[in-house]
């Protein structure tokens, strides 16, 4: 799918760090099998890849399905590789009646540097959104955990969400620091 060369002061972030799958030594982003229950309370699960047909475009793509059991029921999100292999992002979210997401970016993929920030333009439910990812801690090896900041802005540039995430090899997401935004 995507094969990426790595040089000094940067690191390849594999898709398997997001899914909790076994991390390979190569630098290719590919859809490997995932079936992982994770999180402190073991209420989150990621499975895939599976085929999903976008109801707006009719196009079928490979996705991972992530679910979370919560007080308000089951939340389901579908993720795929986006932004020319720079991210894995949501394409669908069950909340608020279900939303199609275009050009989502929820987790960095491929070559990144510690301290690097990248911005991505997309939409959620037809509303324009900007996403900003900043690598906070990277490590040197593909099996090292990754900590990053994820910010979501609305079409006018107002900050809507600001979270720090940590993902660890074989475990998927291991920490979420939700910085409450005053609305």
What are the functions of these language-model segments?
Residues 9-75, 98, 125-183:
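Acidic, serine/threonine-rich low-complexity disordered tracts
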Residues 93-141:
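Solvent-exposed helix/loop surface patches that form functional interfaces
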